[in-house]
């Protein structure tokens, strides 16, 4: 491909308010342009990268026996109504009516539609197992699209779905996908972790996410370097050291205008660990709920929501109305509303908390004696907490979710009547799994993990081109002749390892060398071949590796072999 014929609108100045490195570099290097909030146009270079990623996806899906199909983006509402998600998914779903007034939606995922076709066509155990997949557009009305292509309103997704006769079959399909995902992300050049995750709207069974660590990530993952424990912070667990008891006398203590745990602990000269933090929330399902954690711990809202459903924190007015107590002095003793206490509160230890009386706290509170509660893990794991598996220190990293796998069981097959007859002629629901990868997120994560001050450094497997030839003097006949000769020869070389020809970009623009060098580093092709009059005086061309910036001069007659060798040596 000739640079002069390719549309690569590089930018020098980036609009303000853009922070993610991948967003900045995709704009600067001419890979994407933004149409509106959360809507992006993939330009030729960007589309080539997505196609490279999609090729890897297809190769690995076919390797596990998955069959490619294509589902509509426009869905009739009644299918979503049968599973209940029409009602539980709120503003994120694009909804519309057709000209007859029929309710429709734009697909944000395809569990319902895939299950619908399975319900119509799969009738016998002889037709199972099945794995179907597609690489197709999804739409989600994100409240705050951000991070460039990391969180958008329209995106491409590889989504696959497994259908099995039993739970053992689902385990096999789930593991096949996990193994395929490891191969996919390794081939794409990503550093990643497979972590335990919250299934969210997908169900309530086992699920994992594949996370690419980067400071630009909007997720946080908890990791143990000692044993390999890994989990999204939304579900992560940790152990806390046993707290020695101070055996407080059970009595009220005067704490004038001291409302927060820190204020009271400083006032009394005691560690926050000896306090019970008492929160009041309003649950859509349960109404008012008292939530208790050890004073030095923070609430994990996702964990609590899995227990009580969606909730909001009570205002001062609501607290007074419900409990007759001002916020800051609420405690767990004496209230008859639902209570949930975190495991960080030890049952045999005496604590201090609000006395349910303005300007007073109560000390000597012993859980199980002075109050009862539902006990649960509702706290947020912190850096340096102890690993729940091996007891060593945990660390927390930011990461980008690039893929996920879910065990769905019969969550969709039962309401949509996707049943089959087993060997004994008994009707049973199909057991289902769902698996997704976002190609644009993979591309963005690759940039976040592979860049420098000059631009992108593509892993060679997903680079838009393999090699860039850079003739420096387009008015010099010999320079142009050698560049064209190398362009033809390298393009024709059959790459037996990748089962394809080398894809070569030649920068045939009549531009200054500095401009060509700057653009080459910006767009990030792995190997650069520099051809100039100075080198040709010695009958040599220069090979530069974009990642290491290592250069070497090779003779023109050996250049083709050296170029190919350099390509295979690079990452």
From Swiss-Prot:
UniProt cross-references to Pfam families, sorted A to Z: HGTP_anticodon, tRNA-synt_2b, tRNA_edit
Catalytic activity as recorded in UniProt: tRNA(Pro) + L-proline + ATP = L-prolyl-tRNA(Pro) + AMP + diphosphate
Keyword line: Aminoacyl-tRNA synthetase, ATP-binding, Cytoplasm, Ligase, Nucleotide-binding, Protein biosynthesis
Gene3D superfamilies, per database record: Anticodon-binding domain, Bira Bifunctional Protein, Domain 2
Positions in coiled-coil regions: none
Entry remark concerning the domains of this protein: Consists of three domains: the N-terminal catalytic domain, the editing domain and the C-terminal anticodon-binding domain.
Name by which UniProt lists this protein: Proline--tRNA ligase
Upper classification of the organism: Bacteria, Pseudomonadati, Nitrospirota, Thermodesulfovibrionia, Thermodesulfovibrionales
